[in-house]
């Protein structure tokens, strides 16, 4: 597959990293020569130093033979114009990053398709959806639903209250057990566990289960004492904050703390003021946090444009008794630091957007894919095709790569966990967790 990426910042760089693992034919276009040189020294791709707005640039990059053209520059109009040109010059599919929520309205799909833009992506909406979903469960770091919750993956930080520490997984995760441990993040190491592995205190463990067993998982990991989120404090009043308050359940109330007075006035026009209070002030001001009821807040979400500020703000909130903290960390260099400081949930817009786009590059049998930044791993949902390798043998006979495991499957709308003796059938939606593996190595089992 030939893929052309316009824009070497944030999303473009992260996409280049993902694609380099799969040895795709990738071209990266940008006007910043130094940035291109830095990226090309790390990843196996071709670079073009030029403006993406020029037709000759697109021709030089080989857009006429492109399977996918992705425009993720910082300029929304440039992205849309580049996609229109790329489509007219022969690109099969195009994706434009937009900065306006109105542009992703499904009612506009037909219009954008006609002008040459196959898909639009609004990273702030992806981040807001992730945040709102995570706030529903105060005791979980990450949650990923398959087929509207028929299967659920939960990333949980294990504390001393966990009942299943230091026991071999072969004794815990038996075929009849209501959960599987599909991965463990321990320090800087990601483990695809086997039967002799054990869970240890401070591990970030990824559980695969069905929705009705979520309360049981909460009990065995010792999180029943965590209070459910009702009051949310958000630091930073950008687009992600606005969209997150719109997506939060109706039983939650939010306070947005924003430093810029003019932005506060705009926020009062954008949010539901019955559930959301806008406060003009500095979210780093401890007296302000106390005055606004930080001690009665169950979740603190830091969404400023500064990763350091967000991390420090979450640390402060934790010291004031807030259990659920969420930090927007756009600089990947800070992610490991935030993890080591036990910040809580980390949201990275470019990783979410890159995962969303990455799914478009895979075959139609890949329904969903999620890059788990904390574990440096992917979790993907595949549809088993008639006659595919995965349907011809039981799971233990498939010979999956050692850094991949099948967590569960959905058949006729019902979720099931998978054991070695499970026989996957054509049409099943199968969840695969893999660490540092070319996705193409997994795809071939399902074709």
Predicted segments, located by residue:
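Cytosolic regulatory regions of ion transport systems
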Residues: 1-447
């Amino acid at each position: 597959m030939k893929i052309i990426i316009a824009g070497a910042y944030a999303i473009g760089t992260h996409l280049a990293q993902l694609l380099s693992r799969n040895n795709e034919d990738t071209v990266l276009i940008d006007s910043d020569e130094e940035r291109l040189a830095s990226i090309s020294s790390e990843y196996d791709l071709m670079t073009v130093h030029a403006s993406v707005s020029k037709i000759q640039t697109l021709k030089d990059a080989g857009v006429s033979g492109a399977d996918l053209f992705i425009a993720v520059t910082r300029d929304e109009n440039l992205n849309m114009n580049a996609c229109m040109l790329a489509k007219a010059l022969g690109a099969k599919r195009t994706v434009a990053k937009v900065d306006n929520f109105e542009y992703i309205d499904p009612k506009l799909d037909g219009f954008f398709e006609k002008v040459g833009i196959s898909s639009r992506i609004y990273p702030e909406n992806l981040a807001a959806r992730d945040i709102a979903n995570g706030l529903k469960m105060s005791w979980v770091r990450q949650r990923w639903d398959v087929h509207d919750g028929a299967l659920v993956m939960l990333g949980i930080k294990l504390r001393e209250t966990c009942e299943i520490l230091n026991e071999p997984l072969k004794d815990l995760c038996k075929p009849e057990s209501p959960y599987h441990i599909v991965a463990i993040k321990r320090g800087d190491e990601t483990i695809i566990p086997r039967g002799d592995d054990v869970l240890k205190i401070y591990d970030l463990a990824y559980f695969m289960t069905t929705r009705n067993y979520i309360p049981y998982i909460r009990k065995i990991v010792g999180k029943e004492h965590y209070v459910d989120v009702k009051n949310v404090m958000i630091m930073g009043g950008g687009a992600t904050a606005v969209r997150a308050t719109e997506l939060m359940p109706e039983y939650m109330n939010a306070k947005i703390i924003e430093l810029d007075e003019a932005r506060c006035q705009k926020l009062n026009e954008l949010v539901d003021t019955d559930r959301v209070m806008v406060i003009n002030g500095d979210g780093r001001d401890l007296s302000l946090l106390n005055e606004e009821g930080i001690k009665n807040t169950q979740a603190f979400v830091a969404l400023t444009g500064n990763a350091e500020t967000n991390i420090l703000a979450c640390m402060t909130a934790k010291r004031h008794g807030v259990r659920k903290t969420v930090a927007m960390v756009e600089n990947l260099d800070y992610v490991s630091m935030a993890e080591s400081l036990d910040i809580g949930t980390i949201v990275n817009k470019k990783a979410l957007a890159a995962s969303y786009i990455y799914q478009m590059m895979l075959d139609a049998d890949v329904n969903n894919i999620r890059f788990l930044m904390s574990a440096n791993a992917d979790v993907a949902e595949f549809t088993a095709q008639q006659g595919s390798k995965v349907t011809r043998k039981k799971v233990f006979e498939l010979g999956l790569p050692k850094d991949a495991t099948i967590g569960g499957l959905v058949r006729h709308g019902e979720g099931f966990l998978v054991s070695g003796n499970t026989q996957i059938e054509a049409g099943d939606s199968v969840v695969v967790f893999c660490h540092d593996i070319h996705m193409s190595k997994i795809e071939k089992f399902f074709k």
